[in-house]
Protein backbone atom coordinates (compact mmCIF):
# COMPACT_ATOMS: atom_id res chain seq x y z
CA UNK A 1 0.00 0.00 0.00
CA UNK A 2 2.85 2.37 0.87
CA UNK A 3 4.53 1.76 -2.49
CA UNK A 4 1.24 2.35 -4.30
CA UNK A 5 0.58 5.60 -2.41
CA UNK A 6 4.09 6.88 -3.08
CA UNK A 7 3.82 6.18 -6.82
CA UNK A 8 6.37 3.40 -6.69
CA UNK A 9 4.18 0.74 -8.28
CA UNK A 10 5.26 -0.23 -11.79
CA UNK A 11 4.42 -2.99 -14.24
CA UNK A 12 7.51 -4.83 -12.97
CA UNK A 13 6.76 -4.81 -9.23
CA UNK A 14 2.97 -4.88 -9.17
CA UNK A 15 1.84 -7.76 -6.93
CA UNK A 16 -1.49 -8.09 -8.74
CA UNK A 17 -1.14 -10.99 -11.13
CA UNK A 18 1.79 -12.68 -9.37
CA UNK A 19 -0.31 -15.73 -8.48
CA UNK A 20 -1.57 -16.42 -12.01
CA UNK A 21 1.75 -15.50 -13.63
CA UNK A 22 3.69 -17.91 -11.42
CA UNK A 23 1.25 -20.75 -12.02
CA UNK A 24 1.40 -20.05 -15.78
CA UNK A 25 5.19 -20.36 -15.57
CA UNK A 26 4.83 -23.59 -13.59
CA UNK A 27 2.50 -24.94 -16.26
CA UNK A 28 5.07 -24.15 -18.97
CA UNK A 29 7.78 -25.93 -16.98
CA UNK A 30 5.60 -28.97 -16.29
CA UNK A 31 4.56 -29.15 -19.94
CA UNK A 32 8.22 -29.18 -20.90
CA UNK A 33 9.06 -31.87 -18.34
CA UNK A 34 6.24 -34.03 -19.70
CA UNK A 35 6.80 -33.39 -23.43
CA UNK A 36 10.19 -31.83 -24.12
CA UNK A 37 12.44 -34.64 -22.93
CA UNK A 38 10.98 -37.60 -24.81
CA UNK A 39 12.80 -39.69 -27.42
CA UNK A 40 10.75 -37.96 -30.12
CA UNK A 41 12.45 -34.63 -29.32
CA UNK A 42 16.05 -34.09 -30.40
CA UNK A 43 18.22 -31.10 -29.57
CA UNK A 44 21.31 -32.37 -31.40
CA UNK A 45 20.63 -34.63 -34.38
CA UNK A 46 24.27 -35.30 -35.21
CA UNK A 47 25.54 -36.57 -31.87
CA UNK A 48 23.28 -38.71 -29.64
CA UNK A 49 25.59 -38.28 -26.63
CA UNK A 50 25.44 -34.47 -26.86
CA UNK A 51 21.66 -34.72 -27.28
CA UNK A 52 21.49 -36.78 -24.08
CA UNK A 53 23.64 -34.26 -22.19
CA UNK A 54 21.47 -31.37 -23.39
CA UNK A 55 18.32 -33.17 -22.24
CA UNK A 56 19.84 -33.82 -18.82
CA UNK A 57 20.77 -30.15 -18.48
CA UNK A 58 17.32 -29.02 -19.63
CA UNK A 59 15.69 -31.40 -17.16
CA UNK A 60 17.85 -29.97 -14.37
CA UNK A 61 16.98 -26.43 -15.44
CA UNK A 62 13.29 -27.34 -15.45
CA UNK A 63 13.45 -28.70 -11.91
CA UNK A 64 15.33 -25.55 -10.88
CA UNK A 65 12.69 -23.29 -12.45
CA UNK A 66 9.83 -25.26 -10.93
CA UNK A 67 11.44 -24.90 -7.51
CA UNK A 68 12.10 -21.19 -8.16
CA UNK A 69 8.47 -20.41 -9.02
CA UNK A 70 7.12 -22.44 -6.11
CA UNK A 71 9.50 -20.60 -3.77
CA UNK A 72 8.44 -17.22 -5.15
CA UNK A 73 4.81 -18.12 -4.49
CA UNK A 74 5.67 -19.45 -1.04
CA UNK A 75 7.41 -16.19 -0.09
CA UNK A 76 4.37 -14.18 -1.19
CA UNK A 77 1.49 -16.38 -0.04
CA UNK A 78 2.81 -18.91 2.49
CA UNK A 79 2.48 -18.31 6.21
CA UNK A 80 0.42 -18.89 9.30
CA UNK A 81 -3.32 -19.33 9.20
CA UNK A 82 -5.66 -18.22 11.99
CA UNK A 83 -5.48 -21.69 13.52
CA UNK A 84 -1.71 -21.32 13.99
CA UNK A 85 -0.73 -23.80 11.27
CA UNK A 86 1.94 -22.73 8.79
CA UNK A 87 0.49 -23.21 5.31
CA UNK A 88 2.24 -23.48 1.99
CA UNK A 89 0.85 -23.01 -1.51
CA UNK A 90 -0.91 -25.46 -3.85
CA UNK A 91 1.75 -27.54 -5.57
CA UNK A 92 1.93 -27.78 -9.36
CA UNK A 93 3.70 -31.09 -9.90
CA UNK A 94 2.22 -31.73 -13.36
CA UNK A 95 0.69 -29.85 -16.28
CA UNK A 96 -2.70 -28.52 -15.20
CA UNK A 97 -5.29 -28.39 -17.98
CA UNK A 98 -8.02 -25.75 -18.09
CA UNK A 99 -10.58 -28.38 -17.09
CA UNK A 100 -8.51 -29.41 -14.10
CA UNK A 101 -7.88 -25.77 -13.15
CA UNK A 102 -11.64 -25.16 -13.12
CA UNK A 103 -11.95 -27.68 -10.26
CA UNK A 104 -10.86 -25.22 -7.56
CA UNK A 105 -11.61 -27.64 -4.74
CA UNK A 106 -8.91 -30.00 -6.02
CA UNK A 107 -6.07 -27.63 -5.14
CA UNK A 108 -5.58 -27.66 -1.40
CA UNK A 109 -2.87 -25.86 0.50
CA UNK A 110 -0.37 -28.27 2.00
CA UNK A 111 1.64 -27.35 5.07
CA UNK A 112 4.48 -24.90 4.77
CA UNK A 113 6.94 -27.72 5.43
CA UNK A 114 5.39 -29.98 2.75
CA UNK A 115 5.82 -27.15 0.25
CA UNK A 116 9.45 -26.66 1.28
CA UNK A 117 10.04 -30.43 1.03
CA UNK A 118 8.67 -30.37 -2.54
CA UNK A 119 10.93 -27.44 -3.44
CA UNK A 120 13.97 -29.10 -1.86
CA UNK A 121 13.27 -32.36 -3.73
CA UNK A 122 13.14 -30.49 -7.05
CA UNK A 123 16.39 -28.72 -6.18
CA UNK A 124 18.07 -32.01 -5.24
CA UNK A 125 17.07 -33.32 -8.68
CA UNK A 126 18.42 -30.14 -10.28
CA UNK A 127 21.72 -30.42 -8.40
CA UNK A 128 22.19 -33.96 -9.76
CA UNK A 129 21.54 -32.90 -13.36
CA UNK A 130 23.01 -29.42 -13.73
CA UNK A 131 26.65 -28.70 -14.60
CA UNK A 132 28.98 -27.20 -12.00
CA UNK A 133 29.93 -24.31 -14.28
CA UNK A 134 29.74 -23.32 -17.92
CA UNK A 135 33.31 -22.95 -19.16
CA UNK A 136 35.32 -23.22 -22.33
CA UNK A 137 34.09 -22.52 -25.82
CA UNK A 138 31.65 -25.41 -26.25
CA UNK A 139 28.46 -24.17 -27.91
CA UNK A 140 26.11 -25.96 -25.48
CA UNK A 141 28.10 -26.04 -22.25
CA UNK A 142 30.62 -23.22 -22.70
CA UNK A 143 30.94 -19.82 -21.09
CA UNK A 144 28.56 -18.25 -23.62
CA UNK A 145 25.68 -19.88 -21.71
CA UNK A 146 25.26 -16.89 -19.42
CA UNK A 147 22.43 -16.87 -16.88
CA UNK A 148 21.75 -20.60 -16.87
CA UNK A 149 21.21 -22.48 -13.62
CA UNK A 150 24.14 -24.41 -12.15
CA UNK A 151 24.60 -26.81 -9.26
CA UNK A 152 25.69 -23.87 -7.09
CA UNK A 153 22.60 -21.81 -7.97
CA UNK A 154 20.35 -24.75 -7.07
CA UNK A 155 22.23 -25.29 -3.80
CA UNK A 156 21.86 -21.60 -2.88
CA UNK A 157 18.12 -21.64 -3.58
CA UNK A 158 17.81 -24.84 -1.53
CA UNK A 159 19.60 -23.24 1.42
CA UNK A 160 17.35 -20.18 1.22
CA UNK A 161 14.19 -22.32 1.19
CA UNK A 162 15.45 -24.28 4.21
CA UNK A 163 16.42 -21.06 5.99
CA UNK A 164 12.94 -19.61 5.50
CA UNK A 165 11.34 -22.84 6.74
CA UNK A 166 13.44 -22.70 9.91
CA UNK A 167 12.28 -19.16 10.68
CA UNK A 168 10.15 -18.88 13.84
CA UNK A 169 7.52 -17.04 11.79
CA UNK A 170 7.04 -20.09 9.56
CA UNK A 171 6.63 -22.68 12.31
CA UNK A 172 3.33 -24.03 13.54
CA UNK A 173 2.16 -22.48 16.81
CA UNK A 174 2.95 -25.73 18.63
CA UNK A 175 6.65 -25.23 17.73
CA UNK A 176 7.08 -21.46 18.11
CA UNK A 177 4.71 -18.72 19.13
CA UNK A 178 5.24 -15.14 17.99
CA UNK A 179 4.90 -12.88 21.01
CA UNK A 180 5.78 -9.52 19.47
CA UNK A 181 7.82 -7.81 16.78
CA UNK A 182 10.96 -9.91 16.49
CA UNK A 183 10.05 -11.85 19.63
CA UNK A 184 8.99 -15.45 19.89
CA UNK A 185 8.77 -18.30 22.34
CA UNK A 186 10.07 -21.80 21.51
CA UNK A 187 7.49 -24.39 22.56
CA UNK A 188 9.09 -27.47 20.98
CA UNK A 189 12.89 -27.09 21.08
CA UNK A 190 13.54 -30.47 19.42
CA UNK A 191 11.58 -29.66 16.25
CA UNK A 192 12.85 -26.08 16.21
CA UNK A 193 16.50 -27.18 16.48
CA UNK A 194 16.05 -29.88 13.83
CA UNK A 195 14.86 -27.29 11.30
CA UNK A 196 17.91 -25.13 11.90
CA UNK A 197 20.23 -28.13 11.60
CA UNK A 198 18.68 -28.92 8.20
CA UNK A 199 19.85 -25.54 6.93
Model-flagged regions — what are they?
Residues 1-5, 30-38, 116-140, 148-199:
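Aromatic-residue-lined binding/catalytic grooves and analogous aromatic/hydrophobic interfacial grooves
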Residues 24-28, 87-93, 158:
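Short coil-to-beta-strand
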Residues 2-79, 102-142:
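Conserved, well-structured interaction surfaces
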